[in-house]
Amino acid sequence: MLPDNEIMIREMTMDDLDTVVEIEKECFSVPWSKQGFVDALQKNDAYYIVAVADDRVVGYCGAYGVCDEADINQVAVTEAYRRGGIGEQMVRQLLDGLIKRGYLYTTLEVRKSNAAAIALYEKLGFVSEGIRKNFYEKPTEDAVIMWKR
């Protein structure tokens, strides 16, 4: 695990997108395109952050807001930096930023087989509230719907 002072978490910028897209392709079977991230960053209701270690982006996460609810749609850390607490640091900071933006409730979907992510979200106060059948592709899998209220 890297010490907290060796990780910098900040808002995502357009300059981060080439690295973010590389991480996206590494982590997800149906990755977003660079244009998808450009579009997201241009929306007023979106909030995306990156984790920087060793002078490079090693993870990112983001959410969209509607009224007083936010939906976390991506959390990713490159393989070489996993299991070091970066995901938790990012999600904690994301949640803090969402609260400051007026979002009182936060939801997300996670692959049913992703026990590590589910455990992290539970640690951060999320509760499983349902299943979305066949939500994910490549491979097809159910999503666990989680909420933090």
What residues fall within each predicted segment?
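Accessory recognition modules or surfaces
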Residues: 88, 120, 141-148
